[in-house]
Every structure is written in structure tokens, then in C-alpha cells.
């Protein structure tokens, strides 16, 4: 891919970009120390996923907090490597999908149908086509990816993961500036 204005694998910048073009993401907070983690976990009701802001895949560079009290996290940031982190709120989703699309130099866009992804232990286990979603949800996912490609003036292939909520609406999870592993 030819990358223009794309900070892929930088989760905070990615989520800010997605929100800026009107694509919803999970709530998130930048975390640089244990005090910020404690405050953000309190804000998110004691639950969330702490991730490194750069790199990390298949559950690597992540720590899950579920229904935790909001104290006693001393040393968490150090244990994560003292790197910039992001805490994402949990999303009550029915399934995860991904769309792989490409954009040409002329601005034309082609997108595959969404694949439905199932993970085991944080690692992608299966991707199924067609995804068990409505035509409207599939079209909305493809339109969101087209919006990303156009906003970035991106030329090449991209993969975008989404959480599908009970009402069929979408929450973007992450982008990959390449063919997605699904």
C-alpha cells in the first residue's frame, strides 16, 4: 500500500481519526502511568482492555480488567513495558467482522464482503463468509471502510475490524494497512 497520513498500529491516533470521520469506536483513554489507569478504570466501571498504543496483535500487549475495584494497580504500566498505553472500554457486541478493501490511484474502491471472526484466547480462530449479519450492516461496514480510504487518500489494501451490536450498528475496533488476517 501507498500510505498517506496513516498512523496504523498506533491505537490512539487511529481511534481519534475514526471518531473524527464519524466512525464510532469504544470509549478510550490514553494511559501513561498507574494513576491514569486507576482513574480511567474508575470511569469505565472497573472494566476494560489495556493495550499498548503501538503494535501488539493476537492478544499480545494486552491486559483485561473485569469488574475490578479501582485500586491496587501499582506496577501495571511497568509490567506492560513502560510504553504508552490505551485503555478501551468493553463493548457489548454480538459478533466481530472485518472488511478488506482496496483503493486505486483513481480513487476507485473495491471491498470484499465482511467476514465474521471468532477468537480463542485472543487469537483469530476462524473467519466465515458470509458473516451472519444483515445486508444493511454489511453495506454500512463497507461504506465505513470506503470513508476511511477516501479520508486518508489511501491507495492500497486495508483491513478494518468492527464489532456488530445487537441493533446492527457498528463500532470500529482497529485498522490494518494491509490484508487483514481474516
Where are these regions (language model features)?
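Conserved N-proximal alpha/beta basic substrate-recognition cap immediately N-terminal to
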Residues: 1-44, 48, 55-57
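Glycine- and other small-residue-rich loops at beta-strand/loop junctions that grip anionic moieties
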Residues: 6-7, 26-30, 63, 88-89, ...
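Rossmann-like flavin
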Residues: 51, 59-62
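Short glycine-rich anion-binding loops that position phosphate/pyrophosphate groups of nucleotides
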Residues: 54-55, 102, 178
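Internal nucleotide-binding/catalytic subdomain
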Residues: 65-160, 164-166
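Conserved protein kinase catalytic/activation segment
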Residues: 168-170
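Glycine-rich phosphate/pyrophosphate-binding beta-alpha loops
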Residues: 176-182
